[in-house]
Amino acid sequence: MPELSRLVAAPSVVNIGHGTLNTLSDILADPALCPGSRIVVIAGKNSSQEVTAQLRELVPDATWVTAENGTEEAAQILATELRTTGFDLVIGVGGGRILDIAKFVAAANQWPSIAIATNLAHDGLASPVSILDAQTGRTSVGVTPPVAVIVDLDLLKSTPPAMLSAGIGDILSNISAIA
């Protein structure tokens, strides 16, 4: 028997590369990852037209919601509103704030989620934590990590240089933290 044991929740699928957004169809076809066809996409108001156009082709029947406010209260309201409709899966598309909202909404409703990153300046793509703004500052909320993470390098070409540099810094800090 091990002296120390730890179970770490992690995504089942992590697709990073050129054109990986197209792997979404395969992920959605897997009933172990996507238990149904009722999908809600949570995106930011500044989401790239290119990304949203591609996603609308890949999930034409999805319901789209724009998340404008990264507060815990707004995320709770959104989770409650979406619960009344009932979905099988949440797809978050955007940067850190949007992906944290999507993870929170999914966890609050016990739905799986998929994270589609549109920038790298976020060190919590696959983490079991959502960081949301609260009245007293930022709060960390435990959530279920996404079942899949997609980072399509073709979508990152238009990332502003400052965000790209911040993302590289996040990656390096995570590597050193693990080591």
Description of each model-found segment:
Residues L24, S48-V51, R97-K103, H122-L125:
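Short glycine/serine/threonine-rich phosphate/pyrophosphate-binding segments
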Residues S12, A108-A179:
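A glycine/threonine-rich phosphate-anchoring loop and its flanking beta-alpha core
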Residues G17, S25, G94-G96, G167-G169:
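Glycine-centered flexibility sites
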Residues L82-L120:
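A short, small-residue-rich loop immediately preceding and capping a beta-strand
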Residues S47, N69-G70, R97, L120, ...:
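Glycine-/small-residue-rich active-site loops that bind phosphorylated ligands and cofactors
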Residues M1-L89:
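ATP/NTP phosphate-donor binding region
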